């Protein structure tokens, strides 16, 4: 197999070498590091388009080659460039160029190369440059290679052109300027948006650079993306390239100078406007347009609509989708549009009356002639509105033909234009009203014949005498309608320098150039062969809505072909601060779930920031000259906590620019269980936490221009800290009982949560349960019975547990968005273990503080239920639970890990007894004569667990205000299993000092004790809870020591004070005369 592949590869190489002119026995060796070859991409300049330069250093070689793909030639399109020169051909640049031109026909090679290539020769070396007419990406070039052949193998170097050019940004006129991508911004254009359509723009900013951007980057595309697969993409080839300096062919037109025009040459197409022509013809459709342009408005502003229409076949336009409705066509409502003739046409390619080519489209040539005639013949008559229609010349019986222009009551005069080939027919028509013979160095010899007639009440028919002329008359003609009501209707061909200027120039006499140089440059294309025409039209038409028809892209300078046969395109004026492309989108599409409409645009391989429609709509609605209420964003409800038990609701902020325009700022607040409440700007509505979380799912703010609504879960903080703890117990092998508690899950309603049971890591079918709607998620204790005898096999080790799933789904008429799932395994039970009660889990399940209630919650369980195989049904079991807490005393909220803790003595909270009659019936009973409102027993016949809620006031009452943390322990006394103790520490510095209600605590009964082996990882004790522990004894000794030390200090102080007083009195007496202190 290996030998076969080698043989095949050898055959391919030999065949390729023979095809390209290489020696059959010489291989091709790629050497990208060869110092004798330099291959590089040359960006466009003022003189040339983009180029590929191959420089071979002086040396001993016989052949030089440059190619755009050596090994894939068969797959390349027409116009493939493969140049292989011998050194002996380097006599002069002219001979080099001549040989390059001879390598391919002009009609293919010139589509890639402007004037073929240039060769330069120095001392034994050669420089070969291929200049491209099209941008490299447009002709889809993968790689370029250049190389030389000496006495041995052919050596070449490869340039991956697309990879090389991509990302080259900066100032093309300054080689030292920094290279960076442009800044791309997405915005909504206020001045061209309406209450039914919005214009989104994608703009490239100059970043302060005043010169043009790097001109060599071929990746010039713009793309708009939005929700629901909205996507509009188009090419921007050549818009930023330096304007050409090649002389243009200008027609000397008679009549008023304002109607003089000039066509675009090929250099203009490649450097400013358009870089190639379509090879396909669009299907024939007949939309109606209004021709309208103000000749004095050079900035493309201030157009006024009229009712003039233009009806012609639109194959000569590239504006339309293949699938548009024939009768209703959507066009961008800019005040102008661009026409382009799809293929080069002249008179000799136009079908004649007696020789009709079925593959030859009728309308391309005749539309071109029609526009030309409007400029050449009508002159100042264009002050009247004009409509144009292409019709067929019908041959009658005998030697005559007729042209029929349909009747129109508003038409004042009918004109008909047809053509006569004067190169083959010298006989003039005898019945023509007017003849204009037009022939100069820029066009082929052609005669245009104009027939005219005043208004009639029927279709206007012109008859043509065919005597001697049947073989010379065109098959198609053009009807031109002059309206009775004068209007401003000008038809203007796009000037050559439009793409580099902000304004349409005044095409006066000074713009008319000498046409003698037209034939000197073979690259120029003659008048009537190709051209881009600029027309204007009004918005006085109707259409059917179709989303694809709104993918209308507009760009700077000249209109570009945007995805042929798929998207519309028009032109737009250039902007001084950057380049702008735009797309129009219907408001009805945007207003449907506006918060889901996220837009972004891309230009020059750089993305803009993402923006939602809501971020742009208020600016469009309130910042322009018109106020569009339907576009204003309705205010949405907002919620914040006012205290521990209440929330405040308000209707959000209205855009300031809308308020400045006088919008009513009142809103009506409503909810699932909230009656309509009128709120003025800044006003709030108070609601309790329970009512908000339990009774309401959605809040709404209704204004005169719309309704803003939000789900409760969206208004509350996220559940990033939501955690669930809980336990499952086996009552027997047919029953599972579970409960859970949660932290920071306050934004959930219990009716949105379901429990999914799992055994051995698999969901149990049919075991899922919807939690009670009467409980909040925060207080979600529940029980569930499920037979597991058939699933759990003892003594095989199994696991059982459950997870909580938030299944809140928001239903809309568009789509369903599932709420983010909250999942956490609350408990995993291992069965099949030895019945060693030292392995029992702690009786203290959880100690936590409520996020809003501020209560410390202590949850306990009768954990012997967790191991049913260790419990016999014959034995009656009773266990007493003693719940105690103690606190760490401190003055700082920071935990002092490096210091010994100063703990208070243990305080009794609650004393509860649980009784199991041996048949699975469990009875809980608080040992108290007074009801404790802070004690919850969760179904004393089903679930072996209870919970105690401890307020901050109670903690302060027990220990004083300076408690940094709490420790909780439970001591159980069992008649048959003894006592064990479990301790769990609780720390929460931020919540420790909340003020809440003071609960009623019953008096605590005495606690007895018993002795047994305690479980692992718990605090060991053998004392009764009423007897002092070792910690308590240590605390008492410490206090006695402090008291003794204090007494000793006081005694010493009194002694020292007495001695001092005696000393002072003695010294005072010594200073007095003896008789002063003697007794009298």
Swiss-Prot record:
Compartments reported by the entry: Host membrane
One cellular-component annotation, GO: host cell membrane
Extracellular side stretches: 18-1042
Keyword tags: Glycoprotein, Host membrane, Membrane, Signal, Transmembrane, Transmembrane helix
Keyword Cell wall biogenesis/degradation: no
Transmembrane portions of the chain: 1043-1063
Residues in compartment: Cytoplasmic: 1064-1080
Signal peptide positions on this chain: 1-17
Membrane topology, as annotated: Single-pass type I membrane protein
Subcellular location, principal: host cell
Protein name per Swiss-Prot or TrEMBL: Uncharacterized protein ORF59
Source organism per UniProt: Ostreid herpesvirus 1 (isolate France) (OsHV-1)
Lineage: Viruses, Duplodnaviria, Heunggongvirae, Peploviricota, Herviviricetes
